[in-house]
């Protein structure tokens, strides 16, 4: 019965899931060059996904078999509100404190893998464990992949908001893994728990400082400052040499007689 709920929801709302997956991939690719814009867009996308999951799953199909479904549903609504607030704050953030530029390359890689797992790995794991294709869970509709994708995006943020914004996804993923285990879906429960743990590791990995990030970007793009070699017949330039009045070259330690 529980698996059938996702089939009902996906059959009616699959365009919403398709649009959410496409936007998540675009934002994931955009983050390399425009991290602040990508993170702001991710916050807005995740807010929409949590709101859709609350409305269509918790307040919709799940409530028909479990009246207590409204409680996690309201938690998802609150999460959507916090994500929208975070997106608004990001608009006015400036300077080194602005979002997103400081996740290390390792953190960005692990976070991206968690996002991709939520988008494609989670439904693939369900298919591999014998679930019918029509009842697979997809991002922006089902709560599990939505929480996984959120955890992946949040893990790549520099802002300390990522800890507070990760509470609802982590609590839901832990509760869902226990629910799946209780329903004798041990393999699905194990995959979900492992994905959550990987996301938590990425969440707590050290961040780069703004200076470290700038240095890593220079090394990656090959834009680090290099001194041009002297031209033929030209004396090599000595760092620190200055010109005195009358055109005479002096070193900083030289005193004019």
Q: What residue ranges belong to the model's regions?
A:
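Membrane-interfacial loop-to-transmembrane alpha-helix junctions, especially the N-terminal start
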Residues: 36-47, 103-111, 158-169
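Membrane-interface capping segments at transmembrane-helix boundaries
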Residues: 32, 91-96, 204-218
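Hydrophobic cores of alpha-helical transmembrane segments in multi-pass inner/ER membrane proteins
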Residues: 14-26, 75-91, 143-156, 191-206
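Membrane-helix boundary connector in multi-pass membrane proteins
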Residues: 63-65, 155-167, 174-189
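N-terminal topogenic module of multi-pass integral membrane proteins
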Residues: 1-63
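Loop-to-transmembrane alpha-helix initiation sites
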Residues: 68-73, 182-196
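Membrane-proximal helix-loop-helix units in multi-pass membrane proteins
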Residues: 68-150
């Amino acid at each position: 019965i529980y698996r059938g709920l996702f089939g009902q929801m996906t059959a009616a709302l699959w365009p919403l899931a398709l649009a959410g997956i496409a936007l998540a991939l675009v934002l994931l690719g955009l983050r390399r060059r425009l991290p602040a814009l990508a993170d702001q867009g991710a916050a807005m996308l995740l807010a929409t996904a949590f709101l859709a999951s609350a409305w269509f799953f918790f307040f919709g199909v799940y409530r028909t078999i479990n009246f207590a479904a409204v409680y996690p549903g309201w938690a998802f609504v609150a999460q959507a509100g916090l994500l929208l607030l975070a997106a608004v704050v990001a608009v006015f953030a400036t300077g080194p404190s602005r979002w997103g530029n400081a996740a290390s390359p390792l953190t960005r890689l692990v976070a991206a893998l968690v996002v991709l797992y939520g988008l494609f790995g989670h439904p693939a794991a369900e298919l591999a464990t014998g679930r019918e294709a029509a009842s697979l869970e997809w991002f922006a509709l089902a709560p599990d992949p939505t929480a996984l994708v959120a955890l992946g995006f949040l893990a790549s943020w520099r802002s300390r908001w990522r800890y507070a914004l990760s509470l609802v996804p982590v609590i839901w993923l832990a509760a869902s893994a226990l629910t799946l285990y209780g329903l004798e879906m041990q393999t699905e429960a194990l995959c979900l728990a492992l994905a959550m743990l990987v996301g938590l590791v990425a969440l707590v990995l050290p961040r780069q400082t703004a200076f470290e990030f700038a240095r890593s970007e220079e090394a990656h793009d090959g834009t680090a400052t290099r001194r041009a070699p002297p031209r033929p017949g030209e004396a090599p330039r000595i760092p620190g040499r200055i010109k005195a009045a009358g055109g005479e070259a002096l070193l900083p330690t030289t005193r004019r007689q």
